[in-house]
Amino acid sequence: MTTLNPYFGEFGGMYVPQILVPALKQLEDAFVSAQLDPEFQAAFQDLLKNYAGRPTALTLCQNLTKGTKTKLYLKREDLLHGGAHKTNQVLGQALLAKRMGKTEIIAETGAGQHGVASALACALLGLKCRIYMGAKDIERQSPNVFRMRLMGAEVIPVHSGSSTLKDACNEALRDWSGTYETAHYMLGTAAGPHPYPTIVREFQRMIGEETKAQILEKEGRLPDAVLACVGGGSNAIGMFADFIDEPDVGLIGVEPAGLGIETGQHGAPLKHGKVGIYFGMKSPMMQTSDGQIEESYSISAGLDFPSVGPQHAYLNSIGRADYVSITDDEALDAFKTLSCKEGIIPALESSHALAHALKMIKADPDKEQILVVNLSGRGDKDIFTVHDILKARGEI
């Protein structure tokens, strides 16, 4: 029996080999007790403030909205130590691992940001670190691979399947099945088997909590909508969590449309997938007609995932959040626009959310509205990818 509800409506659950059930139950028990332990909370808050650099800024875009009546704010998770929102929850999970007496961390990574965050947390807290990463992602995210190794992590290339994030997830789970007595699996997003979606949400919810306090201070009211990109969905659920019970605030999640939904080369299972069982949970996913997991695609490695966190599936099913999609080209345009107009280079993942916000502004420039985009990470890791694309197009 679980202590916390493992489901969000019909989505979620704990679909894992029996051998892993005790490890997940131990994790749930440790999390529940840690949430009630003032010492644990004080240690977590201290790391967030003095190591990671929280609270992060809420920045008004001075130039992007000129000539319109929109106020566009960016929640600056790109300013966090490690370069993205991933640092928040790995610090929490690393403290949990120590609490459970674990000595090793297993992690998976796509863009490399969760890998970097896992590596820095392990270096700080004296834990061994093994990171599984698709061989294709290792090629396109070489700066982050070097960062991980520099901080003492072992990076293990995964050549099976599509050599991307879903395959790294499978290998990490396989490793954990044989090592769970000494190792903690530090899952990088708000997906997977219970209790991970709940743990990751709670260790990311300060994004929305800070945003709410900051926007009330700056504007005296809540925003009309908050936007975030959605791969597995951790940065988005971190932003949404504190606004779910605010009915006047729109929640907009932005999935990757890749080369276009009609091409099949995308990563948008919420709107264009079917419900199934994958990665230990019941959630929408990209499937072939005979039920096999289909390969996802996105220019951004961190969104290149064929499923999505179960709470997003639930919010979509009850109509509380809207989920849209943005193509590679639209994300690239937003990447360039923010860089040129505001002097902020966003991650390609975050550029998807920004692109949709810019679409909303362009569609009705005279609408008075306040929008907040969760700028989930910085774009340093993507400059070589973008450089090669722009060079091939003759744009540079």
Swiss-Prot record:
Metabolic or biological pathway, per its Swiss-Prot or TrEMBL entry: Amino-acid biosynthesis; L-tryptophan biosynthesis; L-tryptophan from chorismate: step 5/5
GO biological process: L-tryptophan biosynthetic process
Cofactor: pyridoxal 5'-phosphate
EC numbers, comma separated: 4.2.1.20
Record-linked SUPFAM superfamilies: Tryptophan synthase beta subunit-like PLP-dependent enzymes
Reactions this protein catalyses: (1S,2R)-1-C-(indol-3-yl)glycerol 3-phosphate + L-serine = D-glyceraldehyde 3-phosphate + L-tryptophan + H2O
GO function term, MF aspect, one: tryptophan synthase activity
Principal EC category: lyase
GO CC aspect terms: cytoplasm
Domain of life per record: Bacteria
InterPro entries reported for this sequence: Trp_synth_b_CS (IPR006653), Trp_synth_beta (IPR006654), Trp_synth_beta/beta-like (IPR023026), TrpB-like_PALP (IPR001926), TrpB-like_PALP_sf (IPR036052)
Modified residues annotated as N6-(pyridoxal phosphate)lysine in this record: 86
Keywords tagged on the record: Amino-acid biosynthesis, Aromatic amino acid biosynthesis, Lyase, Pyridoxal phosphate, Tryptophan biosynthesis
Functional summary from the UniProt entry: The beta subunit is responsible for the synthesis of L-tryptophan from indole and L-serine.
NCBIfam families xref list: trpB
PANTHER family registered for this protein in UniProt: TRYPTOPHAN SYNTHASE, TRYPTOPHAN SYNTHASE-RELATED
Assembly: Tetramer of two alpha and two beta chains.
Protein family according to the UniProt entry: Belongs to the TrpB family.
Name of the protein described by the UniProt record: Tryptophan synthase beta chain
Record organism: Yersinia pestis
